[in-house]
Amino acid sequence: MNLLIDNWIPVRPRNGGKVQIINLQSLYCSRDQWRLSLPRDDMELAALALLVCIGQIIAPAKDDVEFRHRIMNPLTEDEFQQLIAPWIDMFYLNHAEHPFMQTKGVKANDVTPMEKLLAGVSGATNCAFVNQPGQGEALCGGCTAIALFNQANQAPGFGGGFKSGLRGGTPVTTFVRGIDLRSTVLLNVLTLPRLQKQFPNESHTENQPTWIKPIKSNESIPASSIGFVRGLFWQPAHIELCDPIGIGKCSCCGQESNLRYTGFLKEKFTFTVNGLWPHPHSPCLVTVKKGEVEEKFLAFTTSAPSWTQISRVVVDKIIQNENGNRVAAVVNQFRNIAPQSPLELIMGGYRNNQASILERRHDVLMFNQGWQQYGNVINEIVTVGLGYKTALRKALYTFAEGFKNKDFKGAGVSVHETAERHFYRQSELLIPDVLANVNFSQADEVIADLRDKLHQLCEMLFNQSVAPYAHHPKLISTLALARATLYKHLRELKPQGGPSNG
């Protein structure tokens, strides 16, 4: 199977209909409007990322004019064939010498089942997800390619002795969403000038993918020596698919396939990458420690909802107080090419504990027209939301722990943790809606209304949290102190001169 020629992309019509498996030419050369259709959101994100990376190497626009033209107009079949011709040999999943995302000649005592390529399907945290039984039993070529790419670039490594991708084990991936799959893919392909800016030393890098020019064992690799093709399709693990079985239904996408893969070989392999490779699909955090600049890609490290990270995802921040961030290059490109357009942002990834997946994350966040110019308003909305969360948590922490030096007994129950989860759940109905609809140039009234709603939410959650203990004689003083703490913090969150409740 060749990813540039054969049918492997699972889609359904944008307005509903049956799942179909199409090829890359059908995607690029037709006005049919498709959306990806896989049973798992992380596999859909991985499929999109794979399509974007393929698009980045075969079809980067030469300038903004060509970029806009390609969004609006499908390629002709001749144009498409010319674009893929130099790359065809690189994308055979079952190539005799250099199969896609694999290493030939892997030595392993046991065959690893395909479910190990599907993040979170097997292992101790499987119960945290809704997984169909047998989902990793036998995968078609398309789902196998998607899973290989996902494991290498967007999921944690296999554990001890195996490396994760260039962005770390659980990077946050961000993409601009278009009206359909074709436009979404093309919106996230950097133009040639932006690609050259992202990778200024490209002519001095190694740019063959790892399955054609393998990484050497124990090699020390400067990140700056990795070309954009090699980096986008980085494979840190030694994996080799076993021979496929015959025709049948793919256990992942559910479609009939002539060949299905049931297992693979893997072996431990180590090397070191020095520095940060400038991946165009992820926001980057910058910190200064002891005068040294440290960079790392944004990751989901807590269960806090995606809105808490928005200011890091769409607003560049120069280093202040030893912290800063850069948004993903694909988001910055859209900001510059479409300065008056609203933004639909796909944001996804995993939260993990070492090699175990704790949570899959996949959100679409909407930003009204004006988001490009009003990063300060976006920052304020996020800061307001986090401020009220902190006020509630501090007050309930006081109630839970008490004050030993003042002889106030605590409830001894982590009500602050439970209330924080409820706050986040409720805030996901409020804050994303504000960002999607706010008139950024006249945001004061909307932010004031948000403050009022969050104030009321804090009061409600505080009262719900303490209600079971309200009549406990030894907690009456502690409750009064905790309530006073809540209103103290809520008053501090009011703008100067604003009214206060309590």
Curated annotation (Swiss-Prot):
GO BP terms: CRISPR-cas system; defense response to virus
Signal peptide: none
Keywords of this entry: Antiviral defense, DNA-binding, RNA-binding
Molecular-function GO terms, alphabetical: DNA binding; RNA binding; zinc ion binding
GO cellular component terms listed in the entry, alphabetical order: protein-containing complex
Result of changing residue 129 to A: 80% increase in phage sensitivity; 500-fold decrease in affinity for target dsDNA
Gene knockout outcome: Loss of resistance to bacteriophage lambda infection, loss of plasmid silencing.
RNA-binding listed as a keyword: yes
Pfam families listed in its UniProt record: CRISPR_Cse1
Inducing or repressing factors: Repressed by H-NS, activated by LeuO. Activated by the BaeSR two-component regulatory system, possibly due to envelope stress. Part of the casABCDE-ygbT-ygbF operon.
Family indicated by similarity: Belongs to the CRISPR associated protein CasA/Cse1 family. Type I-E/Ecoli subfamily.
Subunit details: Part of the Cascade ribonucleoprotein complex, with stoichiometry CasA(1),CasB(2),CasC(6),CasD(1),CasE(1)-crRNA(1). Interacts directly with the 5' end of crRNA, CasB, CasD and CasE. Binding of target ssRNA or dsDNA causes a conformational change in the Cascade complex; CasA is required for high affinity target DNA binding. Interacts with Cas3 once Cascade has recognized target DNA.
Function: CRISPR (clustered regularly interspaced short palindromic repeat), is an adaptive immune system that provides protection against mobile genetic elements (viruses, transposable elements and conjugative plasmids). CRISPR clusters contain sequences complementary to antecedent mobile elements and target invading nucleic acids. CRISPR clusters are transcribed and processed into CRISPR RNA (crRNA). A component of Cascade, which participates in CRISPR interference, the third stage of CRISPR immunity. Cascade binds both crRNA and in a sequence-specific manner negatively supercoiled dsDNA target. This leads to the formation of an R-loop in which the crRNA binds the target DNA, displacing the noncomplementary strand. Cas3 is recruited to Cascade, probably via interactions with CasA, nicks target DNA and then unwinds and cleaves the target, leading to DNA degradation and invader neutralization.
NCBIfam families according to UniProt: casA_cse1, PRK09693.1
Protein name in UniProt: CRISPR system Cascade subunit CasA
Protein's organism: Escherichia coli (strain K12)
